[in-house]
């Protein structure tokens, strides 16, 4: 299981990945090849993030497809579009993504405060119109590591939520080999699969589900 978080700027991007199985920390900065190598080695694992269903997974997939991550970032954050609409190519990158964020959550920083932890904010503005300095990259890496560590803490507090999702995945597989890609789906989606629900046209909309009568 890997925990990950991306930070994206106009001319720089970085990701911190903490591999809980191998107890390793990966820090990748502006290196598409290194990211691809890590993905190829770990694509069958579960990747865990905070709000990763709506953001980080699409940054990861986009970089692997050769897109500029800032374009994807702005498509999602600035224009308010769902990440899956950016390009159909993103669907060709399988990822067992699990998002610890729930619908009513107020954000990772809110969790940090509610858990009694220090809230860390980066001093580097995300709209900076130049390459980051070495000092700014170091500060952003430190901030990103902190966010991943907080994501791990949220996951541990919500372990039962994950276990419940995993049980639904097992039921959805109906005795066949475990398909971990299903871990990305919401509980209603998994319940629909278990109940043999069907979609009315596959538009790629994760909330468009038709339950059987």
Positions of predicted regions on the chain:
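Active-site-proximal helix-loop-helix substrate-binding element of RNase H-like nuclease domains
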Residues: 47, 52, 57, 69-149
């Amino acid at each position: 299981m890997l925990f990950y978080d991306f930070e994206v700027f106009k001319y720089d991007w970085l990701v911190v990945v903490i591999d809980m199985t191998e107890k390793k920390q990966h820090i990748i900065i502006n290196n598409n090849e290194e990211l691809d190598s890590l993905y190829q080695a770990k694509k069958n694992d579960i990747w865990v993030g905070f709000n990763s269903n709506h953001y980080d997974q699409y940054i990861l997939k986009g970089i692997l497809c050769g897109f500029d991550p800032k374009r994807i970032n702005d498509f999602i954050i600035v224009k308010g579009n769902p990440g899956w609409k950016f390009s159909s190519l993103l669907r060709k990158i399988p990822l067992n993504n699990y998002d610890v964020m729930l619908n009513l959550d107020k954000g990772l920083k809110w969790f940090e405060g509610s858990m009694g932890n220090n809230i860390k904010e980066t001093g580097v503005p995300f709209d900076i119109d130049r390459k980051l300095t070495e000092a700014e990259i170091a500060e952003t890496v430190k901030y990103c590591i902190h966010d991943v560590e907080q994501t791990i803490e949220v996951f541990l507090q919500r372990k039962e939520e994950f276990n419940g999702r995993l049980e639904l995945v097992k039921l959805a597989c109906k005795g066949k080999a475990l398909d971990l890609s299903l871990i990305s789906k919401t509980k209603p989606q998994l319940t629909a699969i278990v109940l043999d629900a069907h979609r009315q046209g596959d538009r790629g909309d994760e909330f468009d589900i038709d339950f059987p009568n």
